[in-house]
Structures are given as C-alpha cells and as structure tokens.
C-alpha cells in the first residue's frame, strides 16, 4: 500500500513538473505578460480587426472554433462593409469560416469583445487585435484562457509589428520555422521589387486613394508615405501632409 502511495505521489509530482515546464511567459504586442503552454492549443478564437487575417498566415484554421460574424459570409445579418474588398484570407478559408460558431459581430464599429459569445465557442486561447490593456486583462479574467494581443501596424505585412506578431504566433503554436519562412519571404519580395524598380527613370506621378481607416472610405482617403509605393519607388503625388499614415485630404487638394 505504501509503495502505491509513493508511486502515486511521484507520478503527480512528475505531471505537475511537466505542466510547469511546458508553461512559459510571453509578452504580447501591447506589452502584456501572459502565461501560455506553447503547442498545446486545440480551440482558437480570433477577435478584432486583423487578428483572424494574421492568424490565417501561420496558424491552422482547423483549430478555429469560432469567428466573428463579419468573416462568416453565410450570415445575412452581419457587417458587410468589406464584402466588395478582396480579403485573401476569406477567399482562401471562407468556406470553413461559415461552419463555425459566432464569436461576436466584429468589424470596425465593434470596440469591445463579446465575452459571452466567445465563451459559447469554448476556446482554450484567444488571439485578439483589441489594443486596450485593461480591457484585454479583463477579458482574459472573464474567459479564463490566455488572451494574446497582436498588432499589424500601419505598413501591413512590411511592418515590424506584423513581423513580430508572426514570431509571437510561431512561439505560441510551435510553428517557429513557418513564422521565419513567412517573414523571410515577405522581406525577399520587397527587396526584389526595390531592385527591379530602382533604375526606372520615367516615373508617372501616382495617387493612392480609398485606403481603409476603420472601414471603407472614398477617394479622399490617402497617405503620403504609402509603403507599397516606397518599396516600388513610385512617385507619390501626395506630399506636405501634417502627419503620416492614412488620412483624408481636402477636396481642393485632391483637385
């Protein structure tokens, strides 16, 4: 009997040590320290603008147990402002998204995560793009699972925030090689485009418009430091704006 008790105690101690060893603290993209168990997650929910897109680059969509309504094209009642915009991750995986539970409405007009809807999906981790530390901490407390915040940054896939988000996801889901491959591929493509366009002398002046800013916009929404133009050595006609990033200009300036 004593031997059995000793064996049982040793087994429990071993299991506890294994779980402890598997856990690690990571720092998400808004500086929050979160304890995770890398490679252990089987049920994933992505919330907030950009979270599902970034996860789709690197994570398995088969692990998703819920999506926000904006990404479920089978729903009649949902935000539709991006239906006319090409969203590669929806084109690639949209049929799978339609089979998943609702994790909330989503979209640019939703500023708070819907905890009850997320709980109904029963995730063991949440990937978020809501960049409010207090709200993210509160949501994590409500859900009882890690809530990891990503950031894409103003320059999209060419942004340091995007690259670091890929590295973070790679660590959490134990796909570090894939994260490195994605970042390396994007950097190589940017370098190749720069190389091909560097010696172009006859450059037409170009205006970019309709840039997203918490939803769809019009011809007056532009940027003077549009990253794709910078990489491709394009002559951007927009100059002299007070700040960087996507912003509206006056009709007079457009004309």
Report the location of each language-model feature.
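Bacterial N-terminal signal peptides that target proteins for export
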Residues: 1-10
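A short, structured surface patch at a secondary-structure boundary
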Residues: 52-117, 125, 237
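Extracytoplasmic substrate-binding proteins
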Residues: 135-214, 235-240, 246-248
């Amino acid at each position: 009997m004593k031997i059995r008790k000793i064996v049982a105690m040793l087994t429990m101690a071993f299991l506890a040590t294994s779980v402890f060893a598997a856990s690690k603290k990571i720092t998400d993209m808004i500086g929050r320290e979160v304890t995770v168990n890398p490679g252990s997650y089987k049920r994933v929910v992505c919330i907030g603008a950009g979270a599902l897109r970034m996860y789709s680059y690197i994570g398995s969509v088969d692990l998703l147990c819920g999506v926000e309504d904006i990404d479920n094209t089978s729903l009649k009642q949902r935000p539709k402002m991006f239906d006319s915009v090409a969203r590669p991750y929806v084109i690639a995986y949209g049929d799978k998204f339609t089979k998943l539970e609702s994790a909330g409405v989503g979209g640019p007009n939703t500023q708070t995560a819907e905890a009850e809807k997320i709980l109904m999906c029963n995730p063991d981790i949440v990937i978020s793009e809501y960049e409010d530390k207090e709200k993210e901490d509160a949501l994590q407390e409500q859900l009882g699972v890690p809530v990891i915040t990503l950031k894409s940054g103003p320059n999209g896939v060419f942004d340091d925030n995007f690259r670091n988000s890929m590295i973070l996801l790679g660590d959490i889901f134990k796909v570090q090689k894939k994260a490195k491959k994605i970042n390396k591929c994007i950097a190589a493509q940017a370098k190749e485009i720069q190389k091909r366009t560097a010696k172009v002398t006859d450059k037409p002046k170009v205006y970019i418009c309709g840039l997203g800013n918490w939803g769809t916009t019009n011809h007056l929404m532009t940027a003077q430091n549009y990253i794709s133009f910078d990489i491709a050595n394009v002559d951007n006609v927009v100059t002299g704006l007070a700040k960087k990033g996507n912003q509206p200009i006056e009709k007079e300036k457009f004309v």
